[in-house]
């Protein structure tokens, strides 16, 4: 969608973010309720956290057949997961598949970061201002930015004097990073650190991990999904959906 907007256009609903939640909201608001809906996405493509977090080893720690949309039987039957715990690239491919299958891309404006939201109490309308000073108006606004949309960069003394390369798992470059024959330090052993450490260690000359608080970690026991499992899952979609809904309560 073009970034140039006609400011006279008022949308029924504007969704901020094109990750899992944003895509689902666009589908429900546009296709099920019939609202004129627009998604504003800061990135260049859909994916949300799976667009930004593309560090080595990035992977979901929920099983693939539970980490997906259940509102569309067509998507459930046409998409095949390859692993028990899918990696970042596969999840991103899945979200692009969902976007194209449901025809959502036409209602998403990329490279558009919302910087301010104001409510006009006289006109009962939301006014959204973006980083390029464009304005959008909507009766409803849905924030679907999630809890992982902003990278937390620690303030460490001397960082500005460091002459080497600095990377953050939440702001990983799209192009591959070569760690061959390099000394690497990783700060933190949360989920991102645990996933990245063994992958980076394969190529780095030396790897040092800085850990503040020891944690308990067990092997993921990841595995490829067999054709038998996929077939069984697709034949019992209603059962799995019922079980997952019950597990929420």
What is the meaning of each model-derived region?
Residues 3-10, 14-36, 43-45, 136, ...:
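Rossmann-like dinucleotide-binding core of oxidoreductases
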Residues 29-35, 75-76, 103-108, 123-124:
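Short, charged helix-to-loop "capping" segments that act as catalytic/coupling loops
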Residues 81-148:
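Feature captures the FAD/FMN-dependent oxidoreductase FAD-binding
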Residues 4-10, 32, 47, 52-55, ...:
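FAD-dinucleotide binding site
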Residues 28, 49, 98-101:
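Alpha-helical recognition domains of nuclear gene-regulatory proteins
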Residues 20, 50-52, 81, 115-128, ...:
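Tryptophan-centric aromatic hotspots in well-structured domains and transmembrane helices
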Residues 51-94, 214-249:
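Glycine-rich active-site loop/strand segments that organize a redox cofactor
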Residues 66, 108-109, 164-167:
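Conserved beta-strand scaffold positions in the cores of enzyme catalytic domains, especially
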